[in-house]
UniProtKB/Swiss-Prot annotation:
Extra facts: The mature peptide does not contain cysteine residue.
Keywords attached to this entry: Neurotoxin, Secreted, Signal, Toxin
Species lineage: Eukaryota, Metazoa, Spiralia, Lophotrochozoa, Mollusca
Top-level taxonomic group: Eukaryota
Naturally occurring in which organism (per UniProt): Conus tessulatus (Tessellate cone)
Name this protein carries in UniProt: Conotoxin TsMLCL-02
The UniProt record lists the keyword Transmembrane: no
Length: 62
């Protein structure tokens, strides 16, 4: 008989700790978007440095 109140208390404590699937999906989408943005910024930086170097070699850039 004592197990029932303990079980109910454990259920009440565990239910708010369960992750919300929508919240987890939003967090993973935000992380993925941030990684894609960082990757695009890196590619833009690499391309701009290559173009700048080529421009200096050819004499197009000041």
């Amino acid at each position: 008989m004592l197990c029932l109140p303990v079980f109910i208390i454990l259920l009440l404590l565990a239910s708010p700790a369960a992750p919300n699937p929508l919240e987890r999906r939003i967090q993973s989408d935000l992380i993925r978007a941030a990684l894609e943005d960082a990757d695009m910024k890196t590619e833009k930086g690499i391309l701009s440095s290559i173009m700048g170097t080529l421009g200096k070699i050819v004499g197009l850039a000041p």
